[in-house]
Amino acid sequence: MDWFPLFNSLRIAAISTVVIFFSGIFAAYYIAKLPPILKGVLDVVLTLPLVLPPTVVGYLLLRLLGPTRPLGAFILEAFETKLVMTWWSAIFATVVVAFPLMYRTARGAFESFDRDLADAGRTLGLSNTWIFWRVRMPCCRQGILAGAVLAFARALGEYGATS
């Protein structure tokens, strides 16, 4: 029995989940603090891959990153490699389709965070960075981990956009 396909799927899903984890936390944290109108627009844009069929997402990525397209030509010129039909394109496609799950879950966790805890930290003289890592992240840990698990499962099961 050949185990390479399973290993390859796990490898792509793991790398994609690491990228999604940090970018999803970053996007969710900063978008949760924006005004409602801007938050709504960005929310629609970032969660669009959830409602599009995977083959449509794959087609759009091919059209965007193909070597004859401006972005694909830039990547070809700058890095002397094409991105389409490579191992990296599978990672990029899984990041695109699984990112909304991490983003929405983490954003929900950040929006449900009790701001009085952050205010209490500020009154004690803590910096925003310290409050983020020592107060906000531990309080939002369950939502963030749930988003990471959902993103990993989506990345592991992704076939449409990567085929």
Where are these regions (language model features)?
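The alpha-helix within a helix-turn-helix
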Residues: 121
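Glycine/proline-centered hinge or cleavage motifs at structural transition points of membrane proteins
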Residues: 124-126, 138
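Membrane-helix/interface signature in polytopic inner-membrane proteins
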Residues: 107-118, 128
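Membrane-water interface segments at the C-terminal ends of transmembrane alpha-helices
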Residues: 1-111, 135-163
